[in-house]
UniProtKB/Swiss-Prot annotation:
GO terms for cellular component: sarcomere. It is found in: Cytoplasm, Myofibril, Sarcomere. The modification Phosphoserine is found at S291, S373, S503, S555, S862, S929, S966, S1016. InterPro entries: Atypical_DUSP_subfamA (IPR020405), Dual-sp_phosphatase_cat-dom (IPR000340), Prot-tyrosine_phosphatase-like (IPR029021), Tyr_Pase_dom (IPR000387), TYR_PHOSPHATASE_DUAL_dom (IPR020422). It comes from Mus musculus (Mouse). This is Serine/threonine/tyrosine-interacting-like protein 2. The gene is Styxl2. The modification Phosphothreonine is found at T427. Residues 376-385, 858-871, 1107-1116 have a biased composition (Acidic residues). Belongs to the protein-tyrosine phosphatase family. Non-receptor class dual specificity subfamily. Pfam families: DSPc.
Length: 1138
């Protein structure tokens, strides 16, 4: 292999053998025959086919090999002078210069920026990359990179409906098949991101696709490319340039504000060419429009010269113009040919300028020139239009002054003329009158008509002509117009008054709005001419609406309306100078005057607007007071149930739950619902919040302060009651009953409800009044309702109380109420089984079994009975208090009965009090061996049903009382509890009328019931009786009450069974007589005896300390009860068959 020697040494051309060696070296260094650490596919097992990056050492070796071993380039013999050749540096500089020159080439007919300027604007001193993968660069147009275009989930979230792929097949390899199932329309543009690529061929197609996408319902289009900075951005910019008439820089910056884009030089150059093309097209369109306008101005110039020539012959000019105008008045004025429009506009301008003869002659020369030039060409037409505009600009101020003077002069002439000429001046049929009458008045009239109609047409023309670019001048002119119209108004209204009596059907009074605009017609026309290229059609429309918004109403009302209506309006409006009207009233008057339907009386009424407002205020105040009075009367009627309670409904209102039901706790410590529904014994004891006395007369006014004070009192009492209930809820039930009991011990029958309220209010000390509990009772009444008083007979119960504060009843929880009602019904059902067992025991009380056991069990039962009595009382009462119906539990009903008994017989109440005190002192002794005197009517009621039940059922006690003793009980209780029937029925009446009537049993039954009840240790917030002293004796915590589902019929039946079936010495015959009276209700009770008897038996056996032999007695009782049950069922079946 040849090696290189000195620089001057002659190089030897290698032979073929050496050349092969060189190639071998090249293959070694320039190709990697096997994978190497530099190979792109170094992990591949196959031989690399790629050119590898050459390592530095390999590069040095290769260079040395090439320099030494390969044949050098032969020296060319230069035919040219070496100085004439360009060096590489020169070539590079030239190439750079050419590129920069292309980028800086800003040669353009439309000042299109060069590519370099566009790039500088896009980079903004630094080149940025897009921050987001996708950006919304135009409403519903998104530019995104490749990752977004292939993410179907993201496309769905974006709501994309169209996709324009600017790199279809050249970077973003998607297609319409890729988006199947997404309901996406796809368009792919196959373009590489190189400057030499021609993307302009896709501009139109892509722009049309984008436009179609945005026109679809909820259309959103995604334009994607590899990076979303060049190809996709160029297509969006082309769309903005084509369909939104944006210049190239504006379109690029619109996109750049939303996303960093950087199209390559070639794309920018093609966008620049597109901009030039679009600008050229738009210029051609504008040129066509201008040529059309020039043709119109040529026609206008022709008409101008003709009109000036006709001015010499005033009669022919006036008649012709008035004929033309009269015919045009009846036409629709919005659509007019170009020739007619130009003619009218110029005539309007001429009339507004009021040229003198010299000016007319001077104009005639110029316009005759323009007439001849119209045949030759369009040279003089532009000059004519410009001259018209310049004349208007130079004379606008002078014209305004002249217009005012001309107005005044015409007014004076009109006033001087006769009535007939005045009338003709306002008619629409001047075309016929102009030929027959050629007076000066007619000429003036025709000029005015022309001016008015032309001004109106000039207004219509303003829709198609451009208007001024600012609003200020028009606002000033409007103010001046209004002032002039106001000045004209009074003299015109006087004239119309004179003409009013003789008005004709065809007559027409020109309205002040018309007159106010007459002088402005030429001004408006010239504004249109001067500024026609400065405003958009929308702005022109706004100008028209502001300046001439009444044009249609004017033409319709003015043409069709007679003088009579307008004169009437004027006569009515005569009053308006002295009237201070609101903006709305002024507008209404103007509107009525336009349509010719003004109402004098309405105007006069408007002048009395202040009185009307006062009357409305007074009426509103009266309505408010009447509403308040009705509300208060309803509240009073709620509180005055005594007057008509016999006819009142016996059902408990749902609103009665509202005040206390939500506050009842799970263990039923409070009887707030019972207190809510508590039936007051005497309405006089109800110190409810007094209602304000209100006069009834419709003209009267009531003091709002009194109503507010009353409402404040109501709220305060309600809040106090709620606080008391919360306090009571936090105490155990035994404490509540213990506190309630002593307070109730010494109270009379009328104060029993106050005991209940005392317990509810947390044992508040009774204030010193005639009755110590009257104020507590008022607290109760404030939360609850005014309760009804029972009438003399047992069946008549005045209806349930209706809460006076029903406005606080919005918080009723119906679900909670339903749940509590179900619990109460379950309690009643289980209670029924207990009652049936008690009945069974009473039926068999004369048996030797009971007699044998009674003496021994009395002592054992005394303590247990009290406990169980307390439990039963609280359990029964808990549920009855929770739900609105006061369930006829024995204890509650007995206490109620005694309260009624006291209410109706005060002496017996006093006797009861003394008996209770005596009984309290020696309760245990009495319970161990109750003497017969203790069983007198007042003290007999101390045994609760539950105690009797346990005596008879749980302990299998055979009663020691003889028949005479039981009869004694009955008779004595007849004496003491004459009202018991009433009480019992009254208690049950809180639930239903039927229950109330069912509770009328024989007095003996009731005496037993109430006597047994009197002993019940109910918590005193439950009892309405004075005997709650039992609660003192049974402070043990009450056992959880039994939940017993039962129907409302069960409630009634239970109330019946409560009173009929349990007594210290109850005879089954008595209860059976009552069951015969009640029929099917008794049947239901008997049916349920079997259902719950065994469960209740075991429960009561467990609750008392019994001896083993009692179990045998229980079995005997059960056998006897089953036998009794069978007999009862057979009897009931017999009765049913009968």
């Amino acid at each position: 292999m040849a090696t290189g020697g000195d620089a001057e040494e002659e190089q030897v051309v290698p032979n073929e053998e050496d050349e092969a060696d060189v190639r071998a070296v090249q293959a070694r260094y320039l190709r990697s025959p096997s994978p190497s650490q530099y190979s792109v596919v170094s992990e591949a097992e196959t031989e690399s086919i790629f050119m590898e990056p050459i390592h530095l050492s390999s590069a040095v070796a290769a260079k040395q090999i090439i320099n030494e071993e390969l044949k050098p380039r032969g020296l060319r013999t230069d035919t040219e002078c070496p100085g004439m050749l360009e060096s590489a540096e020169q070539l590079l500089v030239e190439d750079l210069y050419n590129r920069v020159r292309e980028k800086m080439d800003d040669r353009s007919l439309f000042n299109t920026p060069c590519v370099l300027d566009l790039q500088r604007a896009l980079t903004q001193d630094r080149q940025e990359a897009p921050r987001n993968e996708v950006d919304e660069v135009w409403p519903n147009v998104f530019i995104a990179e490749k990752s977004v275009a292939v993410n179907k989930g993201r496309l769905k979230r974006l709501g994309i409906t169209h996709i324009l792929n600017a790199a279809h097949g050249t970077g973003v390899y998607t297609g319409s098949e890729f988006y199947t199932g997404l309901e996406i329309q796809y368009l792919g543009v196959e373009v590489d991101d190189f400057p030499e690529v021609d993307i302009s061929q896709h501009f139109r197609k892509a722009a049309e696709f984008l436009d179609e996408a945005l026109l679809t319902y909820r259309g959103k289009v995604l334009v994607s490319s590899e990076m979303g900075i060049s190809r996709s951005a160029v297509l969006v910019v082309a769309y903005l340039m084509i369909f939104h008439s944006m210049a190239i820089l504006e379109a690029l910056m619109t996109v750049r504000r939303k996303r960093a884009i950087y199209p390559n030089d070639g794309f920018l150059k093609q966008l620049r060419e597109l901009n030039e093309k679009l600008m050229e097209e738009r210029e051609e369109e504008d040129g066509e429009e201008e040529s059309e306008e020039d043709a119109g101005s040529m026609l206008g110039a022709r008409v101008n010269s003709l009109m000036v020539e006709e001015e010499d012959d005033a009669t022919s000019h006036l008649s012709g113009s008035s004929l033309g105008k009269a015919s045009q008045v009846s036409k629709p004025v919005t659509l007019i040919d170009d020739e007619e429009e130009e003619k009218k506009l110029y005539e309007e301008w001429r009339k507004g300028q009021g040229f003198p003869k010299g000016e007319a002659a001077q104009g005639r020369k110029g316009r005759s020139c323009s007439m001849s030039s119209a045949q030759d060409g369009d040279d003089c037409e532009d000059e004519d239009v410009e001259r018209i505009i310049q004349e208007w600009q130079s004379r606008n101020e002078r014209y305004q002054a002249k217009g005012r003077e001309q107005w005044n002069r015409e007014e004076e002439e009109e006033e001087e003329n006769s009535y007939s000429s005045r009338r003709r001046r306002h008619t629409l049929s001047e075309s016929s009158a102009s030929e027959s009458v050629s007076s000066h008045d007619i000429r003036i009239l025709k000029q005015q008509l022309e001016r008015s109609t032309q001004s109106r047409r000039g207004r219509y023309r303003s829709d198609s002509e451009s208007s001024e670019s600012t609003w200020d001048m028009w606002n000033e002119r409007l103010v001046e117009i209004e002032k002039e119209a106001a000045r004209k108004y009074r003299s015109k209204s006087k004239r119309e008054e004179l003409d009013g009596d003789c008005s004709e059907a065809g007559g027409r009074v020109r309205e002040d709005d018309e007159e106010s605009v007459l002088s402005e017609a030429s001004s408006f026309y010239n504004f249109c001419s001067r500024n026609k290229d400065k405003l958009t059609p929308l702005e022109r429309w706004k100008i028209k609406r502001i300046q001439f918004g009444f044009h249609k109403k004017d033409s319709e009302a003015g043409d069709g309306g007679s003088e009579h209506g307008t004169e009437e309006a004027a006569a009515g409006e005569k009053n308006l100078s002295d009237v201070n009207l609101t903006a709305y009233q002024a507008w209404k008057l103007k509107h009525q005057k336009k349509v010719g339907s003004e109402n004098k009386e309405e105007v006069v009424e408007m002048s009395k607007g202040e009185d009307t407002v006062l009357a409305k205020k007074r009426q509103r105040r009266l309505e408010l007071l009447e509403r308040s009075r009705q509300t208060l009367e309803e509240s009073q009627s709620m509180g005055s149930w005594e007057a008509d309670s016999s006819t009142a409904s016996r059902s408990i209102p749902l609103s009665a739950f509202s005040s206390a039901a939500p506050s009842v706790s799970a263990d039923g410590d409070t009887a707030s619902v019972l207190s809510t529904q508590s039936h007051r014994s005497h309405a006089s004891n109800m110190p409810a919040t007094p209602l304000p006395n209100l006069p009834v007369g419709p003209g009267d006014t009531i003091s709002i302060a009194s109503i507010q004070n009353w409402i404040a009192n109501v709220v305060n009492e309600t809040l106090a009651q709620k606080q008391n209930e919360m306090l009571l809820l936090s105490r155990p039930p035994s404490v509540a009953s213990m506190k309630a009991a002593p307070a109730a011990c010494g109270l009379g029958g009328d104060d029993q409800l106050s005991v209940l309220s005392t317990s509810l209010s947390g044992c508040l000390p009774p204030p010193s009044q005639g009755r110590p509990s009257s104020d507590v009772q008022s607290v109760l009444s404030s939360t609850s309702s005014l309760t009804s008083r029972a009438e003399g007979s047992g069946n008549k119960v005045r209806g349930t109380s209706k809460p006076i504060y029903s406005l606080f009843a919005d918080n009723v929880d119906l679900k909670e109420l339903g749940r509590k009602e179900k619990e109460m019904q379950m309690e009643l059902q289980e209670k029924m089984s207990e009652y049936k067992m008690e009945k069974l025991a009473s039926d068999n009380k004369r048996s030797s079994l009971f007699k044998k056991k009674k003496a021994k069990d009395d002592e054992d039962m005394s303590v247990g009975d009290r406990d169980e009595d307390t439990d039963s009382a609280i359990g029964s009462f808990r549920y009855s208090s929770r739900s609105n119906s006061q369930k006829p539990e024995t204890d509650a009903s007995s206490s109620l009965a005694i309260s009624d008994h006291y209410r109706n017989g005060r002496s017996m109440g006093n006797e009861m009090d003394s008996n209770i005190n005596t009984w309290l002192s020696g309760l245990r002794m009495e319970e161990k061996s109750p003497p017969q005197s203790d069983w007198s009517g007042s003290s007999r009621g101390r045994y609760t049903r539950s105690s009797l039940l346990r005596e008879t059922e749980s302990k299998s006690c055979s009663y020691k009382f003889s028949k005479s003793r039981s009869q004694e009980q009955d008779t004595s209780f007849h004496e003491a509890n004459g009202d018991t029937v009433r009480n019992t029925s009254r208690f049950s009446s809180s639930t239903t009328k039927e229950a109330r009537e069912m509770h009328k049993f024989s007095r003996s039954t009731f005496s037993e019931t109430s006597s047994s009840r009197e002993e019940s240790p109910e918590p005193y917030f439950f009892r309405r009786t004075p005997e709650p002293s039992d609660g003192e004796e049974s402070p043990e915590p009450r056992r959880p009450n039994w939940t017993r589902p039962r129907d409302w019929e069960d409630v009634e039946e239970s109330s019946k069974s409560d009173f009929a079936e349990f007594g210290a010495k109850r005879k089954f015959t008595q209860s059976f007589m009552r069951s015969e009276e009640e029929g099917e209700k008794e049947r239901t009770e008997n049916r349920e005896e079997g259902r719950f008897a065994s469960g209740r038996q075991s429960q009561y056996r467990r609750s008392t300390n019994q001896q083993e032999e009692e179990e045998m007695d229980d079995e005997a009782i059960i056998a006897a009860w089953r036998k009794r049950q069978e007999e009862t069922r057979t009897k009931l079946q017999r009765r049913r068959e009968d």
